[in-house]
Amino acid sequence: MLLLALGVLLSGPFAMAQNPQGQVMDWLYEVDQYVPDQGADNRLEAGQRSLLRVLSRTTGLVSIPRTPAVTQALSQPQRYYGQYVYFSPSAVGSQRRQRIDNAKIANQADLAVRFSFQSEAVKQLVRQAKLPSWWSRRPSTLAWIVLDTAQGREIVDSSQTEMVNALSREAARRGLPVLIPSMDLQDSLLVSPAVVWGRFTDLLDEASARYQAQYYLVGRFSVQEVLGQRFYTGEWVARSGNTEDSRFLRGVSFEEVARTGVDMAAQRILDRHLVFGNTVSQHDLVVKGIGSLEAYAQLLDYFESLEFVDGVTLQEITGDALALSLQSLAGLDQLRQLLVDDGRFQSPEAEAEAEADAEIDIGTGFSELVLPGRQQTKTVLQWRSDT
């Protein structure tokens, strides 16, 4: 198997992706909590904590401001979840236990509850509270981590359960899919501990492309053991494209290492994907490559799945191209960026093609920049039927 997922449940933050460029994160709306019993008061408190966690995952905010809408919602969290199910933590796998939201602060109780929240209700709450929106289609981040210990340097893989569990908890907290390399023969031939430690980004770029990861982390940490406790000193680098950010840590636990790395990865994605604003705008879009009713249905289903798209109106059809009007919270530039980043669309490959389209009159085509009765800019994108 190419990807070694950090979790074993297909509903978890380290699930395999059909399209690694933009996984649909269904588990964003599911939260597990330890509870002492099945009493209503404890369920209310657990529901409140879980609602805050879902809001954090779907807005990208580490701390949720207590706006009037949020405060009112916290008084009745049951309005936002569709069901809750109690379960025994000992009856589930260790990876799922590690992702129980309050696992670090709760005693190892014999009872836990899973809340399944309604995505539409949460979406409306986010709008009412005037919070930003982070869509559920999220790219994976690959984590290359090398540890310098008394025994030498080694790359972290799935056998190091302490690190895996810490990364799993933090990825679940932020709602981010994080992968670790399999370190099979192909990886080992290309990436050694020296490559990660030396930050040879040309080799790491090549190795990360194998996993179709647009974003990756490089962690280089020296490990010191004092009285049975391990302390980590070193640097995280978050990289995508040709740009990167770094952060230095000194003498911290691996939990802090994991938290910092996942937060850096999340912020790098949020800088491109977080949608601000509460005003819906109309954008004109031309989508090419829609050659059948099946492709048209797939396109509409895709748009309906996007949190920041409120409506789609078909204006005109010419050949395999559709002229659409989209109602969205995102501005035009960000809308285009989000659609292309997700991997289902691509920009026209040749500027000449775009220029030729712009010369078509609205009566015979629709790629001209002027629509009847109003001046408005159009964006032309190619639908990728192979994704």
Task: Label each PLM-derived region with a short phrase.
Residues 63-145, 156-158, 162:
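Signal peptide-directed extracytoplasmic domains
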Residues 2-11:
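Bacterial N-terminal signal peptides
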Residues 13-17:
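Sec/Tat signal peptide C-region and signal peptidase I cleavage site
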Residues 26-32, 36, 208-259, 330-336, ...:
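Amphipathic beta-strand/beta-sheet edge segments enriched in Tyr/Trp
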Residues 30-76, 169, 203, 253-265, ...:
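Short, well-ordered alpha-helical segments
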Residues 244-254, 265, 273-274, 279-387:
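C-terminal soluble interaction/assembly domains
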Residues 48-73, 137-197, 299-323, 327-329, ...:
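N-terminal segment of the mature soluble domain
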Residues 79-93, 180-182, 196-227, 316, ...:
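A short, hydrophobic beta-strand-centered structural micro-motif
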